[in-house]
């Protein structure tokens, strides 16, 4: 695949997207990755479609409505068999209006088309995987799909909506001993380029490291 990848690879970075509300340790991964690949890439500043934030905030509502549809034969008829977390999600689906769901679907289409247009300028987009280096289990359980989960979803939910392929690449260990990673996003149905770009970054970042547990 690498032989088919034209170099230098054009990598898009929205510096506001990768810094605002993001832990410095997570942003540092982006700087380190760019330094590691060196002349193999050309970094181009881009602007993410601003609708990504609304999609991150309300991803839980879309997920909840679609989950409710999937469980229509069993919920609420067999609600006693459901755990509290799933009940919370299903009830969120019941409380989300059809108008709000339709609005999010329209926003999904807009974001998808605007993001796809960026790939006429760059080969891949580079971003953190999450706004912190690596969350603990407790942090993830506390965030769940609730209103305060948007920061955890800002680098994942928008692409879940749009259908763009993403790839997480290990990027070493941070000073606290936690694993680091970066994320690459490519045009729809361009997994070949995505995997080739991932191989380039993975090779440049060196051998896989494991945290001491």
How would you name each of these model-derived features?
Residues 1-19, 31-36, 40, 96, ...:
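Structural helix-boundary/capping segments
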Residues 102-103, 133-153:
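Short, surface-exposed loop/helix-turn segments at secondary-structure junctions
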Residues 130:
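Short glycine-/small-residue-rich Rossmann-like dinucleotide-binding loops
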């Amino acid at each position: 695949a690498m032989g088919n990848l034209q170099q230098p690879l054009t990598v898009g970075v929205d510096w506001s997207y990768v810094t605002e509300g993001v832990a410095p340790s997570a942003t540092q991964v982006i700087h380190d990755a760019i330094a590691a690949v060196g002349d193999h890439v050309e970094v181009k500043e881009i602007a993410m479609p601003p609708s990504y934030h609304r999609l991150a905030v309300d991803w839980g509502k879309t997920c909840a409505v679609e989950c409710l549809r999937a469980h229509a034969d069993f919920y609420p008829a067999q609600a006693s068999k459901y755990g509290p977390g799933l009940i919370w999600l299903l009830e969120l689906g019941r409380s989300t209006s059809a108008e709000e769901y339709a609005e999010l679907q329209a926003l999904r289409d807009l974001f998808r088309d605007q993001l796809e247009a960026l790939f006429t300028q760059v080969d891949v987009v580079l971003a953190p995987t999450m706004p912190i280096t690596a969350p603990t289990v407790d942090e993830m359980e506390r965030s769940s799909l609730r209103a305060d989960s948007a920061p955890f979803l800002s680098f994942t939910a928008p692409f879940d909506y749009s259908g763009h392929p993403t790839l997480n690449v290990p990027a070493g260990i941070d000073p606290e001993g936690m694993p680091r990673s970066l994320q690459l996003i490519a045009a729809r149905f361009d997994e070949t380029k995505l995997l080739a770009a991932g191989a380039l970054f993975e090779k440049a970042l060196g051998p896989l490291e494991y945290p001491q547990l």
